A protein has these predicted regions:
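Metal-coordinating catalytic core of metallo-dependent amide/deamination hydrolases
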Residues: 1-106
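Active-site-adjacent C-terminal substructures of enzyme catalytic domains
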Residues: 94-95, 103-174
Length: 174
């Protein structure tokens, strides 16, 4: 993945599955989950590629229900994430965010700002993230399988619940 051709190929396969499977299937565009090898050291050029080539082609073919951006240390910054989400919104592609797996990144707040369906991971969380989600429609999603497999701390699910927030659990299995 992480090239225009590879991302489109994967999403076209998902489209075929959606058309033939007897269950509901949703497609996530994951081109903003890491920077492609050819763009190492040229992060802003890769963000340009996502915004100016990948997302327009994904939208033109109607291939994705969601765009999922990994807003965390070593991946995409809050500013880059916002830029990608703004471009996706132009095409009606709804956002999801992976954030706070490695450090408190600001990804929760950018997810809330852009009305993301969910913010996923949340292994590293402060009270600021919990407060940001209160009153929003963005779903905090814990991925305990990822924590277990990578030896990371588990998210503060109880604190989210005590704050009156719903919490979703997911596998992060891909």
């Amino acid at each position: 993945g992480l090239t225009v051709e590879d991302e489109l190929k994967m999403l076209r396969v998902i489209r075929r599955i959606k058309e033939t499977a007897p269950i509901t299937v949703k497609a996530n565009f994951l081109g903003a989950h890491a920077v492609g090898r050819a763009y190492r050291g040229r992060q802003s050029e890769y963000v340009d590629l996502v915004c100016n080539e990948m997302l327009p082609k994904v939208a033109e073919e109607g291939l994705a229900d969601f765009v999922d951006v990994f807003c965390d240390a070593g991946f995409f910054t809050v500013g880059e994430t916002a830029r990608i989400l703004e471009k996706a919104a132009e095409f009606g592609i709804k956002p999801k965010i992976h954030a706070n797996e490695l450090e408190v990144s600001g990804g929760v707040q950018v997810g809330v700002k852009y009305n993301a369906l969910s913010v996923d991971h949340l292994e590293k969380t402060t009270d600021n993230e919990i407060e940001a989600l209160r009153g929003s429609s963005t779903m905090p999603t814990m991925l305990p399988g990822c924590s277990f497999f990578l030896g990371l701390p588990y998210g503060r699910a109880k604190d989210y619940i005590k704050a009156g927030l719903p919490v979703a659990l997911a596998s992060d299995y891909n």
